[in-house]
Amino acid sequence: MGTGAVEHGVARKIAARVRVPRVLVLATVLMAAACSPSGPAFTAYPGGELTPPPVTAADTVYDPARPAPELKLTDQDGKAFDLGSLRGTMALVYFGYTHCPDICPTTLADLRTAAATFGKPVKVVFVTIDPARDTAPAIRAYLDAYKAGFIGLTGTDAEIATAAKAWAVGYEAEPADSNGNYAMTHTSATYLVDASGQLRNHIPFGASPDLVVSLLRTASGG
């Protein structure tokens, strides 16, 4: 399956799951291509812009909110993890991979800032879409650099595929280079789950930490 087919499928799934403007659905999907060395540094959007359209709180809302999909994988300590164990705490769920050169580290840094600014308990959950390289020890080393108490999850190929499908996340490995190195094209959104386990927001790449804080405050009742 080509990258275009994957991107089309991801856009269709996202559009079916969340009421957001089509331009934001496309921006979320197309910006993920920057994780690939063959992808563009910038993506052209309707109107000729080279950056994603501004994101507002209204653009991100699941209407209505719905129970977050199941997420049962292995954490960076090699222990079984169930998203349900975080009930009572807000969570920001992001699918990415440790070899991502740009979008993933940018997103995680922004989520770290947002979580610290929010000032109330919130867990950032990083789910790999590259389990072949992202073992539990590899994820631990990667997330430890952020010094933010992130939860990192991995699993078998089948387990990751099941989780990604449940969350409407698309991903695909790019062709490897002569040294066996490869990049991944993937959905680049962050998912906000409230303390009752409800999926509240689909936050496109490029949303500011201030917006994320605002969404957290709304989801927590202030």
Language model: regions and residue ranges:
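A short beta-strand-turn-helix
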Residues: 71-91
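Structural microenvironment flanking redox-active thiols in thiol-disulfide oxidoreductases
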Residues: 106-163
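N-terminal targeting signals for export/organelle localization
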Residues: 1-70, 74, 222
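Thiol/disulfide oxidoreductase modules built on the thioredoxin-like
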Residues: 159-215
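Short active-site neighborhood of thiol/selenol oxidoreductases, capturing the structured segment around
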Residues: 84-111
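Short loop/turn microsegments at loop-to-beta-strand junctions
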Residues: 68-69, 91, 187-189
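Sec/Tat-exported extracytoplasmic proteins
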Residues: 66, 90, 115-118, 143-146, ...
